[in-house]
Structure formats: structure tokens, C-alpha cells
């Protein structure tokens, strides 16, 4: 019972950290990276479709993305979708492909992205702490049902606390790395 609760908590905390990394990937650092366009939806036969399903996105160089639509006639729609996605990106249409130059980040935008990164990290910390609370609640329920002793509950709660501290430290390390990337000129 206790091991199942700890295993479940660890898996959920790992997913929270993976989600953090995914969300950090969407925050622009001035470097070209395909994940920047992940949230872009392209109208395709009447339905909004993720850009990855209608185009191939590659990194041409450190500050340029190259987008090639799977269907040539979709290039205009992809161009329009990227331009109107609110990412402050202006694609250059070369007929067969789009080139997207990453604009240099101003000090103000860097600070805004840093604040956004901190908010995302705080959400991940809260998620990890909520998982700890759920696990501790499950342990208390087991004590009430007399399935485990109070000593076992305290020991398991301590292990879950240690696990929580480890994952929060990992979140803090990822945040520090992202802030460093954002503030690098």
C-alpha cells in the first residue's frame, strides 16, 4: 500500500516536471527552436489543425526556422497562421517554404519572458506540493482504516517530503537554466 502511494506520487511529480520542460520550450529565448510554433493552429479543410500536422519545421540556423508545408497550396495558410499567432514572428514566404527569423529580444521582452518562466515554474511547484498533499491524505486514510501504523505513516510521509524537496529543487534548477538562457544577450 505505502509503496503504491509513493510510486504514484513519484510518477505524478515526474509528469509535472516533464510538463514544466514542455511549457518552458514554448517560451522564446531568441534562439530558433521548433517548439516555439507548437501552439500555432492552421485552418485545414475547415478545422484548426496543429502546425506540426500540416508542415515540417526545422532549424536552419541559430536564429532562423524553416517551415515546409506538406501541401504546397497550404503555405499561405501556414504563413497567415504564424503571423496571427501572437508570437511576434513575421515569416518570409519564398514560394516553396517559409523562413522565420527570430527577432532579437529587447530587455523588456526578456524580463516579460523571465516572469512568464517564473509563473510556469511556480505552477509546477504547486502541482508537486498538491501531489504531496494527496499522498499524505492517502496515508492518513490508511491509518484511519488501521491498515498501517502511525509510525509507518510518519516514515512514509517523510519519504514523500524528501521526494517533494527533490522535485522542487529540480524545478528550481530548470528555472535557473531557463532564466540564464533568457537573459543571455
Swiss-Prot record:
| UniProt KW Cytoplasm keyword | yes
Q: Name one GO cellular component term.
A: cytosol
Kindly list the biological process annotations in GO that this record carries.
cytoplasmic translational termination
Keywords, sorted A to Z: Cytoplasm, Protein biosynthesis
Q: Name one Pfam family in it.
A: RRF
Positions the record marks as coiled coil are none
**In terms of domain of life, where is this protein from?**
Bacteria
Where does the record say this protein resides? Cytoplasm
> Does the UniProt entry include the keyword NADP?
no
Q: What is its main location?
A: cytoplasm
Cross-referenced CDD domains: RRF
The terms under GO molecular function for this entry are: ribosomal large subunit binding
Q: What is the documented function of this protein?
A: Responsible for the release of ribosomes from messenger RNA at the termination of protein biosynthesis. May increase the efficiency of translation by recycling ribosomes from one round of translation to another.
**What family, per the record?**
Belongs to the RRF family.
- What protein is this chain from? Ribosome-recycling factor
What is the source species? Answer: Pseudomonas fluorescens (strain Pf0-1)
UniProt gene name: frr
Amino acid at each position: 500500500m505505502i509503496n503504491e502511494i509513493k510510486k504514484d506520487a513519484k510518477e505524478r511529480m515526474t509528469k509535472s516536471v516533464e510538463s514544466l520542460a514542455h511549457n518552458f520550450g514554448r517560451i522564446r529565448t531568441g534562439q530558433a527552436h521548433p517548439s516555439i510554433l507548437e501552439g500555432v493552429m492552421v485552418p485545414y479543410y475547415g478545422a484548426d489543425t496543429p502546425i506540426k500536422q500540416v508542415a515540417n519545421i526545422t532549424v536552419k540556423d541559430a536564429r532562423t526556422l524553416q517551415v515546409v508545408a506538406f501541401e504546397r497550396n497550404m503555405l499561405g495558410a501556414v504563413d497567415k497562421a504564424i503571423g496571427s499567432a501572437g508570437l511576434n514572428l513575421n515569416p518570409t514566404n519564398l514560394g516553396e517554404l517559409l523562413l522565420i527569423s527570430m527577432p532579437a529580444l529587447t530587455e523588456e521582452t526578456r524580463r516579460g519572458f523571465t516572469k512568464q518562466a517564473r509563473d510556469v515554474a511556480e505552477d509546477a511547484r504547486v502541482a508537486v506540493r498538491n501531489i504531496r498533499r494527496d499522498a499524505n491524505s492517502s496515508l492518513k486514510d490508511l491509518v484511519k482504516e488501521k491498515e498501517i501504523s502511525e509510525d509507518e505513516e510518519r516514515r512514509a510521509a517523510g519519504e514523500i517530503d524528501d521526494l517533494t524537496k527533490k522535485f522542487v529543487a529540480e524545478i528550481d534548477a530548470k528555472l535557473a537554466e531557463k532564466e540564464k538562457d533568457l537573459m543571455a544577450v
